[in-house]
Amino acid sequence: AACVLGIMSIIREFHPQVEVHGIIAACENMPGCSAYKPGDILTAKNGKTIEVDNTDAEGRLTLADALCYACELGVDEVIDLATLTGACVVALGTNAAGIMGNDDTLVKNLIATADRNGEKYWELPLWDEYFDSLKSDIADMKNTGSRWGGASTAGVFLQKFVKDVKWAHIDIAGVAFLEKPQQEFIKGATGAGVRTLLNYILEQ
């Protein structure tokens, strides 16, 4: 959300040649008597049902509806980013964000743009087999799978809410906040994604 706010707060100063929508799926995340529980069945904006297997995997649920909404806007490309999975941090550490998507050209262009702007993106797979661990007996899918390949299973989950549009997902869990200085970044929030996405938009 902070990345999207950062981009949208300054992008008009650069007069981009393409139409840009910034979407933030903001909601309150708080325990209480009305909080969702394991075993609940949720219905997403596109009508797909989701069995809540793990309440800690809440970010992908809000992203799912945001992706559905974005695809309804008649856009050419959808790029989402989130501090989505600890599994991405395990895989790539704090040196690179994970990226995956349904269009090779879009993914490769984003990786190249990141490289030119001091960020590192590493492509992770979106193989159909990853969805096997998300299958549910009582809904279209579960919100989490096995502990293995967690970044990719989260990506495959999100892909189910993308329709008829080029899409890329960037998992910035490992690079959004640093516990100690690293390369040109100081300790703390890094603004991960802002430089890459802003420059990608301006290059269109």
Question: What spans do the regions from the language model cover?
Answer:
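A generic structural signal for tightly packed, nonpolar segments enriched in small/aliphatic residues
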Residues: A1-Q204
